[in-house]
Amino acid sequence: MNNWQLSYQSPEDLTYHLKKPYLQYDKKEKQVTKVVFDTEANLIWAGDSYGRVSSYDPTYSLYTRHTAHIGSMPVVDLLSNKNGILSLSSDSLHFSNRRGVTQMSLTSADIAQLSDMKTMCYYTNNQNQVLCAGGNTASGIISVDLIKGTLASSTYFTSKVKHMSSNNKLVAIGKQAGSIDLFDPVSNRVIHSLSGHSASITSMDFKDNTLVTAGKSKTFGYLQSDQFINVYDVRIMKQLPPISFSKTPNFVGNHTSSKFPIGADFLQLHPVLPTVVAVASSSGSFDFIDLVNPSLRTPYIHPCKSISQFTLSPSGDYLAFLEEESMINMWNRSNSMSGFTNSAAVLEYQDYPEDSFIPYRVEVGQESYPLSSIGLPYYSETLLSAWPHTVFKTEGIISKKIEGSSSSETDNNSTKSVNRSLSHLSSSKYSLQPYNKFKYGPRNVIEPYKSLRERRKKMVSTTEDNQHRKELLEYKPSNNIDIPPAYSKLQMIYGKFGVMDFDFGGFNTTQYSGLETDIDCVYINEIIHLYRFVPEVYNFVVNCLEDEHIQEKSVLTELGFLFDMMTRANGKICRASNFVDVLESISTANELGLFTDEISTVSGHAGKPSLDEGNLSSHIYNLNLSVDADAEEIMKRSYGKYMTVAQKFNIFLLDRLISEEVERKLHSTDAIVLEELFGLNVDTEIHTLSTCGNFVRQPHLVSSLVVLSPASNNVKYSNKKLSNQTILPYIESSMCRFKQLTARCSKCEKLQNQEYESIVRNLPPLLSLNICLSPEEWTTAKTVNGWLSNHFFATISKDRPILKLQATDLKTSNAIFKYELMSYVARITDDFGEEHLVTYAKILDQKIQQYKWYMFNDFLVQEIDEDEALNISYWWKTPEIVVYSDAEEIRKPFVSVSKLKVDTDILYRDYFSEGIRKDVIRQYRLLTKDEAPGPGTLVALDAEFVSLTEPYLEINCKGMKTLLKPAKKSLARVSLLRGEGELEGVPFIDDYIINECHIEDYLTQFSGIEPGDLDPKLSKKSLVKRQVFYRKMWLLLQLGCVFVGHGLTNDFRQINIYVPESQIRDTSLYYLKGKRYLSLRYLAFAVLRKQVQTGNHDSIEDAHTALLLYRKYLELKEKGVFEMYLENIYDEGRKFGFKVPDTI
């Protein structure tokens, strides 16, 4: 292998296209990640960190370039194919021809196993199927059919894969740990395992019966390239004697600082000579070694600082080196070499139009001849038609209407044709439904004209503009078509500092807190607002925080924490993330399909229906009676067809809260408060209409009533028109439902005609109503003025509820109850059919002792008029859940948590998730009763988090990134230190939070959390459940402690707790307005002259550093030199680039 020489061509930068101006502020690394030769054409392919694939000819001239992977995911592997090029990213597989036209594109949305992919290879000669594998053990090894573009097979593989290579019979799998498995793709199993390298495999090649590998081993704690390459013979399944490849630092020149012999980093079997292997190191030295006679070799040195990739052409005559900074350079055997492959295909290029004269004369009026065929002369001066914008003074006008007889005739003809179409359809089996004005709004209405100047002003207006904010909070519609801005579906916008850049204050000027939309199932926010201002519900839920209930995940406890946080926040934004996390851990909620962002109408579940499918149908099934298929379908269609996800969740939530209260009071004689508040005692009576005469009665209790349209078989409402009826007949009819069905009798076990009657026997203080009406029924209801009654009177007469608008209409001597509308949830449907929920709540103003109505649209909170709140006539507004309260209950005061005798014992003892273990490592000292914290007690805090999901990004055509949804993070570790006293700086809480979810990234460099630290089976840390730590944190907040830390605002947001500013001492005090924020590490260097965070982060160290910084701040503030000292810190920081030097 002599006569190799460096190519005469200068190295070429393959990342030139990534150095465009619009990418210069992108912090993403710009580099080439993979280089391969084309096996069918004289091309070399390069994939980069932005997901783009480029091809170059032997002169480095660009042939094609295309974006292969959405989201600018880096290319991790490339394979040349007879029909094009195959590229792989971590979550997608892309196949295109050589001209860059996509032939197949598969993402994780198409094949779920496409996750954290690292490598791929063919395993057949026809190249029709490809194997892919990577670092996600859950994905295993997948086989993709390139012809069909589908997943062919999937094989479970327990190890992380780094390299794969095939000899078209077997596949060699290089595992991340350094060993090798031989995989048979026919039987989909590993047939043999080979020992490899002690640390990892860096390169591997497999041809015929020869397998060669290069790897790394640990030497004195550092990874060093092995000085031997491993050779295997797969015929005998054994390793042959390794071949030495060792270069001294002096051999490769002075550009390396290594003190150890240099080993092999890259290798490839020669494509023409089967016993020759090309081996190279990252320093640039490379050899051609004969495996039969290893002493026969030819050493070379590539002149560069370092190389990142090394590959041989299919002809064996070219060597490509990818140098530092993505520069490509080549070696060849002689200057006469013509191409990368021996039988190169002819490349296709685009056609160029010929500038020729028109062969015949074209008339000006000839409409069939395209004007684009007439070329324009070349020019070098500014054309006369290029007038400046200052010439045009008009703002733009509307085109004048063309008047004439022709237009009217056309209108008449079109009207006649439409009438003929309508008559034709009406005579057929299909018919057109009349246009629903109340659902879709008026049509054929011309929008008012807005000049370009007005539009321009609207586009450039900012959220700081008071007028714009006023428009944003406008809740009254200007016409019957447009939806007011206050009802728009809100989206959070994330800036450089995440959600901290978002101005929530512009959406809420009240004292009542809204909720962020940065959670799953955003519709849950409105259900929380629905019950937040019901005094009896609030008082009971918050009172449950008085005692410890941390054994299991409790919806009742989490709702109490959330209600208390929203009260304490006093209008500041809050999150319901912890509440949603607890709901997601409940299997029943998942089975009901509650975790979705789609809130449209659902038709129920297959199989046995549950309570949410209607009062009567669920009760029949509770009696274990068999109903035939026809009857079951009729019941589902009648009672569960228009049930929405929010209504299902409302029923689930109330039932869950009641069941948790019952469980807590199993050994107590106390009354079940929520049952008394919401419980409807329902009697279901079933009478068989035959000689059998079977009669069954079963009482039961429901927490929420499904309100349907009055039944046609109800004598009381059969002759009344609903066009002048309020909601009261709907409620009263739903409290007494009657149905006749054919079902199997439980006594004679025969199909008999049966009567089913479901009757409510009581009137609880709170009525939770799920309004389930059809679109046609809503059309009728919206025409009734005052359909949603503000109040009504009710009584029980003859064991049946009677509801009237006036008390004088109830001619009875029984007790009469007045109910007032407390709150309700409405569904808003925009012009594009997208739906979201808003909540209306009636709240008592303590200053003037009058009730006011407020509208909650997630984090937008606005006071509105009562008439507007009760108006449901708009086509875009539909009530779903309504809460009526007894007039006496609504006037009860809200009880503050501060008046409760809260149990604080958990602050003085351990509560591990798996009990007290002997091998647990404690780095803290528990508080004693003598150290009981009180108002003003300083507590230093730092929290660490792990990432559960990746962020969702949107990238436009210019490469600008927009964060749509940040990565979901979970609390991993929290350390709290004493901030004063004899034990100042000593931790009293150092909790690791157990995590049972999939962790996408441990963020070890920033969190100090290692894999296994949060696993109760493996960890030796003090593991606790999140509920345990949260109660400790909540208790310290209630006791009035003052928290000291760095970046506490973000920590408290992720912990999901609101701490008033008066109880926060953040090291952000070291900040000059208009300047950059200083990191904790740099502040420790600049102020304390100490180094922190030298390795992984440690929350105890970070909390203690923040405490010392705060003490220093108080000292400087007392001397009156803090501002001058801070300016010196910034001046010094500019010299170091705000980075900590290696030595202090």
Swiss-Prot record:
Keyword Hydrolase: yes
InterPro entries, sorted: Exonuclease_RNaseT/DNA_pol3, PAN2, PAN2-PAN3_catalytic_subunit, PAN2_N, PAN2_UCH_dom, Papain-like_cys_pep_sf, RNaseH-like_sf, RNaseH_sf
PROSITE patterns: USP_3
Domain Exonuclease: 939-1110
Catalytic reactions on record: Exonucleolytic cleavage of poly(A) to 5'-AMP
Cellular-component GO terms for this entry: P-body; PAN complex
Per-repeat ranges for WD: 27-66, 153-193, 196-233, 302-341
Matches recorded under PANTHER family: DEADENYLATION COMPLEX CATALYTIC SUBUNIT PAN2, PAN2-PAN3 DEADENYLATION COMPLEX CATALYTIC SUBUNIT PAN2
Note on domains (UniProt): Contains a pseudo-UCH domain. This ubiquitin C-terminal hydrolase (UCH)-like or ubiquitin specific protease (USP)-like domain is predicted to be catalytically inactive because it lacks the active site catalytic triad characteristic of thiol proteases, with residues at the equivalent structural positions that are incompatible with catalysis, and it cannot bind ubiquitin. It functions as a structural scaffold for intra- and intermolecular interactions in the complex.
Protein name listed in UniProt: PAN2-PAN3 deadenylation complex catalytic subunit PAN2
Organism: Kluyveromyces lactis (strain ATCC 8585 / CBS 2359 / DSM 70799 / NBRC 1267 / NRRL Y-1140 / WM37)
Protein's gene: PAN2
